[in-house]
């Protein structure tokens, strides 16, 4: 197989987005558009990926990192000019180069693979990905000869009235023989209505040289959607959400209301899990088998075990075990690890805490910067007092300990194995194992106190 290369065009400013955020960094289902494009392209076993950057270059580099090399297009002088900036990386290489727009987040590796196969089968020097649009206004048109071969591609602004009637459009995705591309691109001129160097002109030059030019028509116009404004962004979001949700349902996940369920492209969900409306799964969220998630639950970059129930709660950058019950209205903050068969109840906040198997915090508690052992019971209103205004300190609660209601554990402090803390205590010193800690004022009852104050 020939070497494969890809060039992502991501240098446009995107003024129609009316945003301070660089266009290709606008997220679709929680993931920047350009990263959708890069991840799909990388599935094609590329020898090299080059992203053309301009406005917001550093932000794009930060987002894609080591996935790509980068070439700067300092002035936006057209698509051919943009591709030309990749010449230092690709000039002289033998193989096939795919050119993709960074604002086409719905384009799949499967479609690009089909285009590459068409390119190879036809022995073409260039192949364009086309689609049929009900309303082709604004798109370049594919002009074919009588025998059906691609004759040229005409930009909308340069098209004649007759050419504008054509509904087969240029999607802006191409593949080229790499050596032919960088030879011919030097011949492209800017003699057109926009005064720009158009990449489709490479097709016409190759055609004039007698080279074979092919076209692969995808049957899915939605997949080729280019995002240029917030309306198109919302359409891309809708189409991507439908695609993601359909894939999970086909893999054995029940979505009670797919229209109101939001799942990241990179999320993984096990079979027989049920997702209720209002659930948002972000980033690298991973859900096990037979879970119940939602309604109104947000899980981000977290791993959830099997048979776990999470209702009306938030889990962020944490790990949750099997057979756990969380919520309603619980918050698992970053760097927490929740064991198996745990209960985290209503209005409980866990932060940077190791929470052992079968332990419980059922109501109205804050457990932060703590190590909680197995079989621990934290009563209603249990608080780890972890911050002195300058520094956070660790609280250790060992296996089998029992913390009574409305107790404050002032860190750094350790409650030993099997120890009890009496309700209402403020514990400032370590509690030995099997001991009872009582740290509260002794109750005093003053007889007839109320009667006497009313006499005054």
Swiss-Prot record:
Residues noted as binding Mg(2+) in the record, renumbered to the chain: 103, 228
Active-site feature positions: 363
Domain of life of the native organism: Bacteria
Positions of the UniProt region annotated as N-acetyltransferase: 252-456
Keywords for the protein's UniProt record, in alphabetical order: Acyltransferase, Cell shape, Cell wall biogenesis/degradation, Cytoplasm, Magnesium, Metal-binding, Multifunctional enzyme, Nucleotidyltransferase, Peptidoglycan synthesis, Repeat, Transferase
Stored CDD domains: GT2_GlmU_N_bac, LbH_GlmU_C
Single GO term (MF): UDP-N-acetylglucosamine diphosphorylase activity
UniProt: UDP-N-acetyl-alpha-D-glucosamine binding residues: 9-12, 23, 73, 78-79, 140, 155, 170, 228, 333, 351, 366, 377
Protein name as annotated: Bifunctional protein GlmU
Annotated source species: Bacillus velezensis (strain DSM 23117 / BGSC 10A6 / LMG 26770 / FZB42)
Gene: glmU
């Amino acid at each position: 197989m020939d070497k494969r290369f890809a060039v992502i065009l991501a240098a446009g400013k995107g003024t129609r987005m009316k945003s301070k955020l660089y266009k290709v960094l606008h997220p679709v289902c929680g993931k920047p558009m350009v990263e959708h494009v890069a991840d799909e392209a990388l599935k094609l076993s590329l020898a090299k990926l080059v992203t053309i950057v301009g406005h917001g270059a550093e932000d794009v580099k930060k987002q894609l990192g080591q996935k790509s090399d980068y070439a700067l297009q300092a002035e936006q002088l057209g698509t051919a000019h943009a591709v030309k900036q990749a010449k230092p990386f690709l000039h002289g290489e033998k193989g096939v180069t795919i050119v993709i727009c960074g604002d086409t987040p719905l384009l799949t590796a499967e479609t690009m693979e089909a285009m590459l196969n068409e390119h190879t089968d036809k022995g073409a020097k260039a192949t364009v990905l086309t689609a049929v649009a009900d309303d082709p206004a604004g798109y370049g048109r594919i002009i074919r000869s009588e025998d059906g071969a691609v004759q040229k591609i005409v930009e909308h602004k340069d098209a004649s009235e007759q050419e504008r009637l054509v509904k087969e459009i240029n999607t802006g995705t191409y593949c080229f023989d790499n050596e032919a591309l960088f030879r011919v691109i030097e011949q492209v001129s800017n003699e057109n209505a926009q005064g720009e160097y158009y990449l489709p002109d490479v097709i016409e030059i190759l055609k004039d040289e007698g080279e074979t030019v092919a076209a692969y028509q995808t049957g899915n116009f939605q997949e080729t959607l280019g995002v240029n404004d917030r309306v198109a962004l919302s359409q891309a979001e809708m189409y991507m959400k439908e695609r993601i949700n359909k894939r999970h349902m086909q893999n054995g996940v029940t979505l009670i209301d797919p229209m109101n369920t939001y799942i990241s492209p990179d999320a993984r969900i096990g079979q027989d899990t049920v997702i209720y409306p209002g659930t948002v799964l972000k980033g690298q969220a991973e859900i096990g088998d037979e879970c119940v998630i939602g309604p109104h639950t947000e899980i981000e970059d977290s791993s959830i075990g099997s048979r776990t129930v999470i209702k009306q709660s938030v889990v962020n950058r944490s790990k949750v075990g099997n057979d756990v019950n969380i919520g309603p209205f619980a918050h698992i903050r970053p760097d927490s690890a929740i064991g198996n068969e745990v209960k985290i109840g209503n209005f409980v906040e866990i932060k940077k805490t190791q929470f052992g198997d079968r332990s419980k915090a059922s109501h109205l508690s804050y457990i932060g910067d703590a190590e909680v052992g197995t079989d621990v019971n934290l009563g209603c209103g249990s608080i780890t007092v972890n911050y002195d205004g300058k520094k956070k300190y660790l609280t250790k609660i060992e296996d089998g300990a029992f913390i009574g209601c409305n107790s404050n554990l002032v860190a750094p402090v350790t409650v030993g194995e099997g120890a009890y803390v009496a309700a209402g205590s403020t514990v400032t010193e370590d509690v030995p194992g099997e001991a009872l800690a009582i740290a509260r004022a002794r109750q005093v009852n003053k007889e007839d106190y109320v009667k006497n104050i009313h006499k005054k």
